Amino acid sequence: LVGSSGKHSNIFTFFLNSITHNIPFKVWANATRNLIDVDDFYDIVHNILNSNMYLNSIINIANPRSYAVPYIVESMENYLGKRALYDTIDKGADFDIDTAQIQPVIEKLNISFDDAYLYRLLKKYHEL
């Protein structure tokens, strides 16, 4: 979940803070992370609750696309115009989150989880 909490307790703000302040960190080469804007998350949940969809059900609310951690770091480097100080280690795993149930809601709300989504998150939560 990406938002402007001001805390460095999620991977998005941790990487941004580390790159910006030249703090070395480790990148798990095989790991993926799912990043979704808190506003998109809210809109999806709000729509589901207000339309009484999926009553008494467990559903996944996530970005339909998870990002490889090295790709996240590379995208941040490109956005910031600055190299990150990191070591890559052979750890982590890819995981899939089934978001098929919320696809109609995503389409209804016109939320675009396209190739530029990560860039839009960077621009929204870390103005240059």
State what each model feature region is.
Residues N10, Y67-V69, D87-I106, I111-Y117:
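Active-site loop of classical SDR/Rossmann-like NAD(P)-dependent oxidoreductases
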Residues L1-R33, V38:
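NAD(P)-dependent short-chain dehydrogenase/reductase
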Residues F15, H21-I23, I44-N47, S51-G92:
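Mid/C-terminal beta-alpha module of Rossmann-like enzyme folds, strongest
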Residues W28, A62, Q103:
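Residue-level detector of conserved, well-ordered beta-strand and adjacent loop positions
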Residues D39-N50, Y119, K123:
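Amphipathic alpha-helical segments that line or abut small-molecule/effector binding pockets
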Residues S112-L128:
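Amphipathic terminal alpha-helices
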Residues I11-F15, I19, I44, A116-L121:
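Conserved short hydrophobic patches within well-ordered secondary structure
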